[in-house]
Amino acid sequence: MNDAIYKSIKTLPPLDDTVVKIQQICRDENTAIGELVDVIKKDPMLTANILHSANSPLYGFSREITEINQAVNLFGMATIRGFALYGAIKQNFKINLDPYSLNSEQFLDIVSTQNALAFDWCKKLGGEFLNVISPASFLMEVGKIIIAKELIESGKADEFKKAFDEIKSLKELSELEISLVGVD
């Protein structure tokens, strides 16, 4: 692995206490959803983000969701865990995805849409894998933040962006990232 990428990963900011508590609660099979709601209520920004998402057409809930306990019950612990991770990314990362021709708003929209798709897909399959797939859907694009940072710092962003505009497949994207940054 590229040393600069390794250092970037090692220096990522720690998760805040709310996110850590949510992670712990969601890992404990004996935890009641009420405990999760209590932790979320202490974080107004997370509460607002969850309620905003619950009322987004992406999730297709049939009525307006006004209470955080309603949203937590509808989404379930796994998706709430993902929202907490998403909020941590949004708050703690300086997102500059210019090499990928994305701004932070577009990036966060992609992450949110991926989670909505994962949520719907898992629900149709009975929700069995939601505890893994939902948080993963939020995190799978984080590598782009780190790679973009390395491209910018190493002076390869323009070269990457020019080649990126010609990319036609994920395989080609992976090959480009490997060739310029040295990771896959």
Can you say where each PLM-predicted feature lies in the sequence?
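Conserved alpha-helical "signature site"
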Residues: 1-184
